Amino acid sequence: MMKKIDVKILDPRVRKEFPLPTYATSGSAGLDLRACLDDAVELAPGDTTLVPTGLAIHIADPSLAAMMLPRSGLGHKHGIVLGNLVGLIDSDYQGQLMISVWNRGQDSFTIQPGERIAQMIFVPVVQAEFNLVEDFDATDRGEGGFGHSGRQ
């Protein structure tokens, strides 16, 4: 069953100059988010900037959250990723969606108005309830940490 999410358009250019977020294909998990900018923004290597989307969402359902992720092509080809690596949007957040863009590449990168710069997915949320215990039931792995399960 499709879940409907309320979207508020904060910038009148959205839907006129810049399309609403869309799924690129029928199998796409992520919606493309666009840079709602007046002018192009040049991002020097190592720099970060906050880019508005012109949109606010209200998920409302506490069993859902949204995550903003980098677009694979921008990251691989240009070193453009999210400054916070992953953006988490809680179900009760109602403010504008802002994208922290980080140029981890070697060359300057120009973000154009309306350019697709991130993607957003919706994920189920399970809130944990902690149960204080003295010991855990034994497992094969035990307390083995980083690299314990091997490479193969």
UniProtKB/Swiss-Prot annotation:
Its cofactor is Mg(2+). Its EC number is 3.6.1.23. Pfam families: dUTPase (PF00692). One of its GO terms (biological process) is dUMP biosynthetic process. It comes from the Bacteria. InterPro entries: dUTPase (IPR008181), dUTPase-like (IPR029054), dUTPase-like_sf (IPR036157), dUTPase_trimeric (IPR033704). It catalyses: dUTP + H2O = dUMP + diphosphate + H(+). The keyword Hydrolase applies. Substrate binds at R71, S72, G73, N84, L88, I89, D90, M98. Signal peptide: none annotated. Pathway: Pyrimidine metabolism; dUMP biosynthesis; dUMP from dCTP (dUTP route): step 2/2. One of its GO terms (molecular function) is magnesium ion binding. Keywords: Hydrolase, Magnesium, Metal-binding, Nucleotide metabolism. This enzyme is involved in nucleotide metabolism: it produces dUMP, the immediate precursor of thymidine nucleotides and it decreases the intracellular concentration of dUTP so that uracil cannot be incorporated into DNA. Belongs to the dUTPase family. PANTHER family: DEOXYURIDINE 5'-TRIPHOSPHATE NUCLEOTIDOHYDROLASE (PTHR11241:SF0). This is Deoxyuridine 5'-triphosphate nucleotidohydrolase. The gene is dut.
